[in-house]
Amino acid sequence: MTTSDVVRVRFCPSPTGTPHVGLIRTALFNWAYARHTGGTFVFRIEDTDSARDSEDSYLALLDALRWLGMDWDEGPEIGGPYGPYRQSQRLDIYTDVIERLLAAGEAYEAFSTAEEVEARHIAAGRNPKLGYDNYDRDLTEEQRAAFRAEGRRPVVRLRMPDTDLTWVDLVRGETTFPAGSVPDFALTRGNGEPLYPLVNPVDDALMKITHVLRGEDLLPSTPRQLALYGALIRIGVADTTPQFAHLPSVLGEGNKKLSKRDPQSNLFLHRDRGFIPEGLLNYLALLGWSIADDHDIFSLEEMVAAFDVADVNSSPARFDQKKADALNAEHIRLLDEAEFARRLGAYFATHGHRTGLDDAQFAEAARLVQTRIVVLGDAWELLKFLDDASFTLDEKSAAKELKAEAVPVLGAALEALRGVEAWDTAAIEEALKGALIDRLELKPRKAFGPVRVAATGSSVSPPLFESLELLGRDRSLARLQAGRDHAAAAAAPQG
């Protein structure tokens, strides 16, 4: 590609269901290629299927791209020189193109029913499931008029060329479909509504798309699109044929293609768990591409600087949740403390989690958990002890730590902490170590395990002394007293 070439790529989902990680991976590769080349990223909505499309799904697509920071240069909400960018608003354009294809002899009206096509195959000794047999190509005007008189409504089909259809795929290399392997295909329904095989290439042509980066599941449709491009060029709708790159499939468990039924395919489930955009985008980038053999962790800016579609692997990529989680944890650690606190606060607010801390205290709480979590949702499990309404004693932790031997430990801890004047981490640490390590001569685990469980409800928590400072004097003492009472009750004879 020369520097004078202007790259124009597009992301053109249908607004059905919730955004799928494979779909977003395709968007990411298109976006990164546009940004790498200084080109244009076009966002287009393919919403011509009124039975399946929904406004909620359309809004979810906008939400997904905005959350991930993949801004578009042309498309819904912002417009552009080749709008409108929703296919449902472009029907007059498709009608005009169909009329021009018919007038030029590039397409024709086909009246055959599926039953008639199957019967002709059987009569000729062919497989009845071969598909359309090009029977209507050369109907006379009288025959067409007779079919119309019967009330038949034709579909419009493209007249496929009797030549091999070859392209050099930017991911898979030279690919050829031999002449005759693809029958004349429908551009419209019988009611005249345009179909995907027409509208997708027409929009690409009119929007001057130069590179089509899409999933490999669409590879079989490429010869039809090449043939249609040839016709569109001849009637003056298209200037040229774009370059194609078919991206590898994303597999799920058992090496089966990741489907919408697989939980990990739902982009918003990852967001709800607490993935941050940097972590998820880093992982999605690795589904078919790598920045270097020994370099899995990178920023979006680093990806943009390095991304070339020619480097995309053709082999299927497997979605590995553990690997995705690990990368997200690394990106959480890379955030500066103030930014992490901001994001964690926003996540807690969205999910209704309350800590009762002021901004400075919350920033400190966030600092304590930043290196201890994989997703933002993990932080609530570590910090929910700060909310009295959410505080509970974990049964396993209590059974292990709040036993008979915990009674004197918690008693000594209470006595020591009641004498602390300045309720801060250093004073709390000094008091507890003096009472439990120095005077009772306990090992740290035996000394602090019961205190941790009594105060936070769990054996797993942020650092103990800092946690007690955040909890405050009164609540800390009340929790330790309740923990001592629990231990005493557990030790008392039953019956």
From Swiss-Prot:
InterPro entries assigned to the protein according to its UniProt record, in alphabetical order: aa-tRNA-synth_I_cd-bd, aa-tRNA-synth_I_codon-bd_sub2, aa_tRNA-synth_I_cd-bd_sf, Glu-tRNA-ligase_bac/mito, Glu-tRNA-synth_I_codon-bd_sub1, Glu/Gln-tRNA-synth, Glu/Gln-tRNA-synth_Ib_cat-dom, Glu_tRNA_lig_a-bdl
UniProt keyword Ligase, yes or no: yes
Keyword flag Cell inner membrane: no
Enzyme's top EC category: ligase
Motif ('HIGH' region): 13-23
Subcellular localization(s) per the UniProt record: Cytoplasm
Catalytic reactions on record: tRNA(Glu) + L-glutamate + ATP = L-glutamyl-tRNA(Glu) + AMP + diphosphate
SUPFAM superfamilies linked: An anticodon-binding domain of class I aminoacyl-tRNA synthetases, Nucleotidylyl transferase
Origin: domain of life: Bacteria
Its EC number(s): 6.1.1.17
Record keywords: Aminoacyl-tRNA synthetase, ATP-binding, Cytoplasm, Ligase, Nucleotide-binding, Protein biosynthesis
Major localization listed first in the record, in broad terms: cytoplasm
Binding site residues for ATP: 260
CDD domains documented for this protein: GluRS_core
Pfam families: Anticodon_2, tRNA-synt_1c
GO cellular component, one term: cytosol
GO terms classed as biological process: glutamyl-tRNA aminoacylation
Sequence motif: 'KMSKS' region, positions: 257-261
GO MF assignments: ATP binding; glutamate-tRNA ligase activity; tRNA binding; zinc ion binding
Family, similarity comment: Belongs to the class-I aminoacyl-tRNA synthetase family. Glutamate--tRNA ligase type 1 subfamily.
Subunit composition and interactions: Monomer.
Entry function: Catalyzes the attachment of glutamate to tRNA(Glu) in a two-step reaction: glutamate is first activated by ATP to form Glu-AMP and then transferred to the acceptor end of tRNA(Glu).
Annotated protein name in UniProt: Glutamate--tRNA ligase
Gene: gltX
